[in-house]
A protein has these predicted regions:
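Long, charge-dense
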Residues: 50-51, 83, 87-124
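A glycine-rich, hydrophobic loop/mini-helix early in the fold
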Residues: 24-72, 78-79
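Gly/Ser/Thr-rich loops at beta-strand to alpha-helix junctions
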Residues: 21-24, 77-86, 106
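Charge-biased, low-complexity intrinsically disordered regions
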Residues: 1, 46, 53, 58-61, ...
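Active-site helix-to-loop segments that bind/position phosphate- or nucleotide-bearing substrates
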Residues: 111-135, 139, 148
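Short glycine-rich or small-residue beta-strand-to-loop segments that form or flank ligand, phosphate
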Residues: 18-19, 71-77, 102-103
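Two-metal-ion RNase H-like nuclease active-site motif
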Residues: 2-23
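Charge-patterned, long linear interaction tracts outside catalytic cores
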Residues: 134-173
Length: 173
């Protein structure tokens, strides 16, 4: 795996946070593009028929109008289905962008601390120190980057059909 060197990590670095949830016909995948922890730039959606989401996420990102500006892909074990399989190394190679996987992922695993909280992560295609700088730039509070937090909220709203008033509109049965 080639380690990508990012020249400068600005507070407005564009990252994409990916969240997924199982549905009756496969896995719905949402990607949220954020500028650091400051602005939402876009929302992407795709579907994977199988449990290996690597190819579906790769294609979703490469087809996006944001592809040229996305510098890092953020994943979290806590925003993916338990049965889902994803290779952060293969994703990094396929998309040509580094991947930071919170909550584990593939070896090696590092620990990151922010404002009294800590999280473990793995980094593919980027050094540990660059990954920590990106996590710091893309996180407002705690240890969850804004892109991942908003991707999880968006997926939850779409999947559960919650309207703007917070009322669940999911049909019964």
């Amino acid at each position: 795996m080639v380690i990508k060197r990012l020249r400068q990590i600005k507070k407005e670095i564009r990252v994409i946070g990916v969240a997924a949830q199982c549905d009756p016909v496969g896995i719905t995948i949402i990607g949220v593009v954020f500028r650091g922890s400051l602005w939402l730039d876009g929302v992407l959606k795709t579907h994977s028929a199988g449990v290996d989401m690597t190819e579906a996420i790769s294609e979703m990102i490469k087809r996006s109008q944001h592809y040229g500006q996305i510098r890092v892909i953020l994943l979290s074990r806590f925003s993916l289905p338990m049965e889902a399989k994803i290779s952060s190394n293969n994703l990094s190679v396929n998309v040509g962008r580094p991947v930071i996987f919170l909550g584990g992922g593939e070896e090696p695993i590092y620990t990151w601390r922010n404002r009294g909280e800590q999280a473990v992560f793995s980094a593919s295609g980027i050094s540990r120190w660059s990954a920590e700088s990106i996590l710091k730039a893309s996180t407002r509070e705690g240890v969850t980057p804004e892109a991942l937090r908003v991707a999880t909220l968006t997926l939850s709203a779409l999947h559960n059909r919650v309207d703007a008033q917070g009322i669940n509109r999911t049909p019964p049965g």
